[in-house]
Amino acid sequence: MSNHKDIWLQCETIIYSQVTLKEKMQAICNLLGSQMPAYDWVGFYLSDVKNKKLYLGPFYGEPTEHTSISYGKGVCGQAAEAQKTFVIDDVAEEKNYIACSIHVKSEIVVPIIKNEIVVGQIDIDSHTPAAFKQEDQQMLEKICRELAIYIE
C-alpha cells in the first residue's frame, strides 16, 4: 500500500507548482488514482455557490454522467450542503446515494472550503468496501485545505 506521507509530499509539490488550478487538480487526480490502489475514481467538483450546484472538473477514471449535482443530492451534494467530509463504507446502505457504477462499494467526499463557503470538493470512489481509513481522510482534507488557497 502506498505511503500517505509520500503521496502528500507529491501532492504538496503539485499544489505549489506554477501551473493552473485545473492542471493542479488533474495532476492530483492522476497521482491519487495511479498510486492509491483502492482509489478507483478520483474527481474534483467545483461549486456554483449562487445556484447551489456542483460541476465536474478534472478526474481520473471512467467518465461519469454525473457532471452536475445539486446541493443535498447524493453524497457529493450532502457534503457540499453540510460543509463536512462524508465517508461511506457501504454505498448500498446509503439512502441518498447516486450510483456511478455498479462496481463502487465505498466513497469519500471532502469539501474544499474557503471563507466558510464550499468552493469545491474531491470525490473518490472505490470498488473495495470500507476502503477509506482515517489516514485517507486526513490526507485528503489536507489536500483540500491547501488547494482552497488557489480557488477564486
Where are these regions (language model features)?
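Intrinsically disordered, low-complexity terminal regulatory regions
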Residues: 1-63
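Short hydrophobic/aromatic beta-strand element in the GNAT-like acyltransferase core
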Residues: 41, 109, 121
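Regulatory sensory and allosteric helical modules in signal-transduction proteins
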Residues: 47-53, 57-99
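Sensory-domain boundary capping and coupling elements
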Residues: 113-126
